[in-house]
Amino acid sequence: MASVARLRNVVIDCPDPHALAAFYAAVAGGTLVAEEADWVVLKLPDGLRLGFQLAEGYTPPEWPRADHNSQQFHLDFDAGPTWEDVDAAEKKVLELGARLLRREEDPVAEDFRVYADPAGHPFCLCRID
C-alpha cells in the first residue's frame, strides 16, 4: 500500500527544548539541525528526527497511569545485548539527569528498564539480543 506521507519528526513537548535536545543528543548521538527559542530538532545518526517544542505550563506525564495525565508515548533505546551494557547506559543517563522509574528484579522476564528524562517523559533502555 502506498503511503500518504513520510514521517518527518517525532515531536516532544517540554519546558526547555534546548536542554531536552542536549539530553537526548548525549543519550543517542546526532546533531542539532534546527534551533529557535521555542523549537529544536535533533537528527539522530540513523536519520530519525526528534523535535522538542516549548510547551508553556508543561506538566510531565505520570508513569504508569491511565487517566488524564498519563504517558502519551515513550522512546525505547537499544542499550546492547547484555545487562552489563544496560548497566553502563543506565549510569550515563542517570548522570545526564534521567530518573529511574522501574528496574525489573527478574531480568529473565523483562528486557528493559524504565526512566524519566529531565522533563519527565518516560523512556526505556532495552537489552536487545
Language-model region placement:
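Short, small/polar residue-rich loop motifs at catalytic or cofactor-binding pockets
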Residues: 108-110
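Short hydrophobic/aromatic beta-strand element in the GNAT-like acyltransferase core
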Residues: 39-41, 112-114
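Glyoxalase I/VOC metalloenzyme domain signal
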Residues: 1-8, 12-34, 43-99, 116-129
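Short, basic/aromatic recognition patches
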Residues: 101-105
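Short glycine/proline-centered loop/turn elements that form peptide/ligand docking sites
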Residues: 36-38, 106
